[in-house]
UniProtKB/Swiss-Prot annotation:
Name of the protein in question: Double-headed protease inhibitor, submandibular gland
One Pfam match: Kazal_1
Localization per record: Secreted
Disulfide-bond pairs as recorded: 12-46, 24-43, 32-64, 68-97, 75-94, 83-115
Domain (Kazal-like) ranges: 6-66, 67-115
An example molecular function term from Gene Ontology annotations: serine-type endopeptidase inhibitor activity
Primary location class: secreted
Amino acid sequence: DPPPAIGREVDCSSYKGKGSQIACPRHLQPICGTDHNTYSNECMFCALTLNKEFEVRKLQDTACDIECTEYSDMCTMDYRPLCGSDGKNYSNKCIFCNAVVRSRGTIFLAKHGEC
């Protein structure tokens, strides 16, 4: 038997428009996919995962998490980019966490890697 799948399937049938086009509302209700990307809402999740080469499921009904409780004001120059919900690339977790703290938590992880 294969291992159980992680996450929950999302029923995307209600978001289908004409042909393969999906038109999504702009309301922000972030969800985290099993690909560790944050999607602005369930409709955008459906639109952006429709043609992926692998199945993506919903991991949680909030933005994907990055643990920022233990971060340093002084950051190294290592390059492991993170994309913030503000559309900016952060060179590494430390720099991202500093931005999260400065924004008082309004910035969250959009995805691992560059925007």
